Amino acid sequence: MRALICESYGPIAQLRVREVVTPAPGPGEVRIRVESAAVNFPDALIVQGLYQVKPALPFSPGAELAGVVEAVGEGVRHLQVGQRVISFCGHGAFAEQAVVNARQVVPMPEGMDMDTGAALLLTYGTSLHALKDVGCLRAGETLLVLGAAGGVGLAAIEIAKQMGARVIAAASSEDKLRLCREVGAHETIHYTTEDLRQRVDALTDGQGVQMVCDPVGGDYTEPALRATAWRGRYLVVGFAAGAIPKVPLNLALLKERAILGVFWGDAVRRDPAAHLANLQQLAAWFAEGRIRPVISERVGLDGARDAIQRMAARQVQGKVVVHPHA
């Protein structure tokens, strides 16, 4: 089978598509024919050795997929050969076949296509966990989303609207802000031409926002934290800007602000029941037409490396989906 392979930690450019042996599932595992796999920012980090998890070399990147079960390992009871499934696998999705721990695989909701299934899990799962489980977003509150045209940001906009919140989307270009408005943002901030804190003050009558969802980090973290209201919550979701920011902790003290970390991947492992409940909620919203992943591009396996590079350079809006068999 063909797979995009990382043979040593380093630049994304060294990734190559190789012919490799088709793996067999072990006990508690399933092998999936990958029909669609989505590109996410952690893919860029993991191949450079910069992510929290470092797979044994060589490996294929790709954290989420949709496909069809082709083989079932010993002890697997809830999945059958031929079943359409989705999986948050962590790595291994950019390949024609993937062997995955069966506990990380769930049946695909009725009416969902492969591309949507692949694009839903990580970004929407992260955003729902962040806003509901960690941040406890309430109806009527105002949420500021940084990096709002990325996968997590767009998902956060849609989910926050379903939760009854007002959404302010911040992004770095007018094209990105236009997309944010299309998916439901109430207000937008062009944070390369506007002062983030001043604009938030103007949009909230000087009160600040109750919550910030930040998958970006970098230079906008401190002004966004300063723009939170009394007892506001700041969700640390990721560091797409590259730099991990350092902020004065007196900012937390002054308005009793809470700085909350969001590690969805580990939360899935620690509380699978909560993860399943969130997936069921996402599936229901999708079936009702309330959420819809923005898929900006589809590429074959030979285009996956370039897609990861563009993701790292923050040149992607929404999600890029890889079709390994194209």
Where are these regions (language model features)?
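Glycine-rich beta-strand-centered segment in the early N-terminal region that forms part
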Residues: 21-38, 50-92
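NAD(P)H dinucleotide-binding glycine-rich loop of Rossmann-like/cofactor-binding domains
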Residues: 33, 45, 84-147, 182
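Mid-domain Rossmann-like dinucleotide-binding core that forms the NAD(H)/NADP(H) cofactor-binding site
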Residues: 80, 118-194
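Short glycine-centered segments of the SAM/dcSAM-binding site in methyltransferase folds
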Residues: 84, 142, 166, 232-233, ...
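Short, glycine/polar-rich helix-capping loops at beta-to-alpha or helix-loop-helix junctions
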Residues: 93-96, 171-179, 244-249
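Short amphipathic alpha-helix with an adjacent loop that forms part of the alpha/beta core around
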Residues: 195-206
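Glycine-rich phosphate-binding loop and adjacent beta-alpha segment
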Residues: 219-291, 323-326
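C-terminal capping/lid region of NAD(P)-dependent oxidoreductase domains
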Residues: 283, 288-297, 305-326
